[in-house]
């Protein structure tokens, strides 16, 4: 019945990493065609915020325009989201490209193949040129082009170090050697740069093998093999399946991973069409994903048995089909063009992305990008999530928009005349983020990830007002946020943060103690989130929006700070202060008063629940102005005010101390109220009525029970004026601290929990150590030769005076049904809120030093304590069911013994 702002039960083990959100952005629309996209770091010493190179194959009538799209996020304080095209060359039927610093001058050069022909049935007999375009070190067009070599049908290439590390090498593989010839094997070629790559000579050419219908070449750099390999490994995907080539210092070696899709009569395509290597934990080759076959419809993954050696070449691989996307067409092709591995969610294990060209007729399943995530390492099970529904012929991964570790995704529509032409070909990026912004009329919807399941920090500035830049921040568990000491402030919306200074440790949660007041200023250079992560508003100093005191509304102009990568509709918004008398809800009140409102920001979770975290809006009032007494009888939320500027230093919240019926909000008697002054950069605690354990009281209409209350600016002569400015955070109902504060009788830690006296012969246990939700919690009798007592982590729930009890091995929480039922049996679960349970326990100590665990107080129920049943467990003679019972039962005390 009562929602909470904490993101997960406090002592539940760290949640698995969830995929981030993706902010789509058009890089280039209106293209004539589309085939290749590549993330291109302009300099060789940095891969952050790379440019993008994209192009199509072109036609006989129109050469392909090779363009570098300059990343607008590569420079700080850039206000544009436009990717400026720089033409590098015009080529005939270019296919693949890669890059390397060939000249060793610190700038990456482009390596590209062209003169392919219009299709596999039209291979240029004297084509298949491999060239490099020299980077001039500045954003200049028409880069100097030099030839590396030739081989008809040249289709894929990668730069690396395959037999030596002192110069750039290129592995290049044709797909076929002649028009319509699907049977003759093509050479696998290594080109090695000469001493002077700017000379006109061709590069040294070595043939290291032959393969059939190779559609994809990938490399595993030696630097990523944890010292296992001296040189880069080459992954080939073609009719022969998926295999690995590498040079061992003496000779070339081959390891066949798998043969891929089996051959079928009448189908010219079998084997594989694309492959990529995925890291799992400490193994750089935990799995190998594959698209099958040439332009196929099958997604497969190769796995190796548990305990196998790390890497590719010392393991035996087994193929598993994950998905088949629709039937093949009459030409035996489907919609899959590429697979790519990258750590999309930041958990240290790679996901893999599947590029889907599209279908005719259009098909949601076969268009865009799918992301496969490993969810069960033991059984190598994957989940599947749609990232984009825009045609994707190729995928490039990089961090395109920040200096962090997030992985963004770039795609280009597949549009090849005479084969498959997607409508409206375009290049797009999908920027990894924890926050998405969307315009809602005059307000903004900010959708955020669950902090406990993200591995990336996200900061989004959104408003500059009253001398502060307001920034929404999502912090993963145990994450650090650098701030400006004694200047920056934080208002926590979910989770916990803490910092330390010379006075000790300071913790902030969504609400301080009821009717209290607390500073938001951080007295340290950084703060850290707790194990559940945190979502907060960071107040940073601003030189744009003035400094208090604010003498007129002209000094309180609010500035839109949304970053360039959010939708233009959000960036174009104005956030005016509106006189409250002009708001439709004023109904004639506040006439001629210096009382203004600025709306507003909805913060919701970006999952299927779409649960509300808070609504945020700003208010300002001049000297002597009352914001009007009210009690939220028509809306249910818990409101916290965070003051940016207190004009007189005397403004704050007043609330009625008499029964509601005895208070006249239109003509208030201030002697019937109490005041809490809320100074600059302070927030007040809950003003709503709560039960003793911190749950909000509800009225008959399910609204939060508030006394009459109002913000009253300090009294005085408004000449000169001095405005109060505060931010209202309107939360759904949540639990807070107990009233009055109980004594702290228990130190969080790991314990064996024994029933009654510590020498008693029964201890708290989860049946069979079973992590399944709903597993009974028992009191196990100690028997000779039996197992040791199970260990439990007892943890204080931040922002409350309650505790949780989590099984040390499984993470299951000791839970009871909510609303509570007397004599109910207690069970272990990981998701109490979703199952109508509570995991909260109040803790007291009796005169013998024994502990009692009590459920939170609830309407129509007396105290209910964690206890044991008088009836033995039916299936286990040595077990007693654990239940909740009333306070008339003597058997409700427990003893705690520290455990390892």
From Swiss-Prot:
1,5-anhydro-D-fructose binds at residues 627, 630, 641, 726. Pfam families: AUDH_beta_propeller, AUDH_Cupin. Homodimer. It comes from the Eukaryota. Its cofactor is Zn(2+). A bifunctional enzyme which catalyzes the dehydration of anhydrofructose into ascopyrone M, and the isomerization of ascopyrone M into microthecin. To a lesser extent, can also act on 2-dehydro-D-glucopyranose (D-glucosone), leading to the antibiotic cortalcerone. Zn(2+) 1 binds at residues 215, 295, 337. Zn(2+) 3 binds at residues 630, 632, 639, 709. One of its GO terms (molecular function) is aldos-2-ulose dehydratase activity. Ascopyrone M 1 binds at residues 35, 116, 120, 155, 215, 295, 337, 414, 419. Pathway: Carbohydrate metabolism; 1,5-anhydro-D-fructose degradation. SUPFAM superfamilies: Integrin alpha N-terminal domain. Mg(2+) binds at residues 101, 103, 105, 107, 109. This is Aldos-2-ulose dehydratase. Keywords: Isomerase, Lyase, Magnesium, Metal-binding, Multifunctional enzyme, Zinc. Ascopyrone M 2 binds at residues 627, 639, 641, 726.
């Amino acid at each position: 019945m009562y929602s909470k702002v904490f993101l997960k039960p406090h002592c539940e083990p760290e949640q698995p990493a969830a995929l981030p959100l993706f902010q789509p952005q058009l890089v280039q629309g209106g293209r004539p065609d589309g085939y290749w996209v590549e993330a291109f770091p302009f300099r060789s010493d940095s891969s952050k915020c790379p440019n993008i190179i994209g192009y199509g194959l072109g036609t006989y009538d129109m050469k392909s325009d090779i363009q570098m799209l300059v990343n607008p996020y590569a420079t700080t304080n850039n206000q544009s989201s436009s990717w400026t095209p720089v033409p590098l060359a015009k080529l005939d039927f270019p296919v693949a490209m890669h890059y390397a610093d060939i000249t060793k001058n610190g700038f990456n050069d482009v390596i590209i193949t062209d003169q392919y022909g219009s299709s596999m049935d039209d291979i240029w007999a004297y084509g298949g040129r491999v060239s490099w375009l020299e980077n001039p070190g500045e954003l200049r067009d028409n880069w100097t082009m030099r030839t590396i070599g030739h081989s008809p049908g040249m289709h894929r290439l990668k730069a690396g170090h395959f037999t030596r590390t002192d110069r750039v090498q290129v592995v290049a593989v044709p797909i076929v050697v002649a028009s319509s010839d699907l049977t003759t094997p093509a050479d696998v070629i290594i080109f090695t740069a000469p001493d002077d790559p700017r000379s006109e000579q061709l590069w040294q050419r070595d043939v290291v093998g032959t393969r059939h219908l190779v559609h994809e070449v990938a490399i595993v750099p030696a630097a990523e093999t944890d010292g296992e390999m001296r040189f880069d490994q080459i992954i080939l995907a073609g009719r022969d399946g998926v295999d690995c080539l590498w040079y061992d210092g003496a000779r070339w070696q081959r390891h066949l991973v798998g043969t891929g899709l089996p051959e079928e009569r009448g189908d010219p395509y079998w084997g594989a069409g694309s492959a990529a290597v995925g890291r799992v934990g400490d193994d750089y080759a935990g799995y190998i994903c594959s698209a099958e076959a040439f332009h196929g419809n099958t997604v497969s993954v190769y796995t190796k048995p548990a305990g196998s050696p790390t890497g590719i070449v010392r393991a035996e691989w087994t193929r598993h089909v994950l998905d088949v996307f629709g039937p093949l067409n009459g030409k035996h092709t489907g919609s899959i063009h590429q697979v790519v591995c990258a750590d999309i969610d930041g958990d240290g294990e790679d996901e893999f992305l599947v590029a889907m060209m599209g279908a005719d007729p259009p098909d949601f399943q076969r268009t865009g990008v799918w992301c496969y995530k490993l969810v069960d390492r033991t059984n190598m099970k994957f989940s599947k999530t749609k990232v984009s529904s825009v045609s994707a012929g190729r995928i490039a991964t990089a961090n395109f928009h920040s200096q962090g570790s997030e992985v963004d995704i770039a795609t280009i529509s597949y549009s090849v005349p005479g084969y498959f032409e997607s409508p409206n070909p375009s290049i797009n990026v999908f920027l990894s983020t924890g926050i998405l912004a969307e315009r809602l009329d005059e307000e903004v919807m900010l959708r955020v990830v669950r902090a406990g399941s993200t591995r990336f920090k996200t900061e989004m500035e959104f408003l500059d007002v009253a001398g502060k830049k307001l920034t929404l921040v999502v912090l993963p568990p145990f994450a650090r946020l650098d701030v400006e000491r004694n200047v920056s402030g934080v208002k926590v919306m979910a989770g916990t943060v803490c910092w330390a200074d010379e006075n000790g440790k300071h913790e902030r949660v969504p609400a301080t103690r009821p009717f209290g007041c607390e500073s938001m200023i951080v007295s340290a250079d950084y703060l850290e989130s707790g194990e559940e992560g945190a979502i907060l508003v960071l107040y940073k100093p601003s030189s744009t929006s003035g400094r208090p005191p604010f003498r007129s509304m002209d000094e309180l102009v609010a500035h839109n700070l949304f970053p360039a990568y959010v939708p233009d509709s959000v960036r174009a918004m104005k956030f005016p202060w509106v006189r409250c008398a002009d708001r439709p809800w004023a109904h004639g009140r506040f006439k001629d008063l210096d009382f203004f409102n600025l709306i507003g920001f909805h913060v919701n979770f970006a999952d299927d629940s779409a649960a509300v975290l808070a609504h945020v809006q700003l208010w300002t009032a001049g000297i002597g102005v009352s914001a009007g007494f009210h009690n939220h009888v028509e809306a249910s939320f818990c409101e916290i005010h965070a003051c940016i500027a207190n004009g007189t230093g005397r403004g704050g919240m007043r609330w009625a101390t008499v029964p509601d019926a005895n208070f006249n909000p239109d003509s208030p008697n201030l002697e019937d109220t109490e005041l809490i002054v809320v100074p600059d950069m302070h927030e007040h605690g809950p003003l709503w009525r709560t039960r003793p354990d911190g749950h909000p009281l509800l009225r008959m209409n399910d609204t939060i029970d508030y006394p009459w209350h109002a913000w009253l600016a300090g009294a005085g002569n408004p000449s000169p004026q001095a405005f109060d400015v505060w931010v209202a955070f309107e939360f759904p109902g949540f639990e807070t601290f107990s009233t009055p504060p109980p004594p702290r009788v228990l130190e969080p830690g790991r314990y064996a929990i024994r029933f009654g006296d510590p020498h008693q012969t029964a201890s708290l246990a989860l049946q069979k150590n079973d992590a399944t939700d709903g597993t009974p919690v028992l009191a196990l009798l100690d028997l000779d030769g039996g197992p040791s007592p199970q260990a439990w982590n007892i943890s204080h729930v931040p922002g409350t005076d309650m505790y949780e009890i989590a099984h040390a091995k499984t993470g299951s929480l000791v839970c009871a049904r909510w609303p509570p039922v007397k004599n109910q049996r207690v069970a272990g679960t990981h998701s109490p809120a979703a199952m109508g349970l509570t995991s909260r326990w109040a803790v007291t100590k009796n005169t013998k030093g024994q502990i009692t665990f009590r459920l939170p107080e609830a309407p129509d129920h007396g105290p209910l304590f964690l206890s044991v049943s008088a009836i033995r467990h039916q299936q286990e003679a040595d077990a007693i069911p654990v239940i909740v019972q009333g306070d008339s039962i003597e058997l409700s005390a427990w003893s705690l013994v520290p455990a390892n």
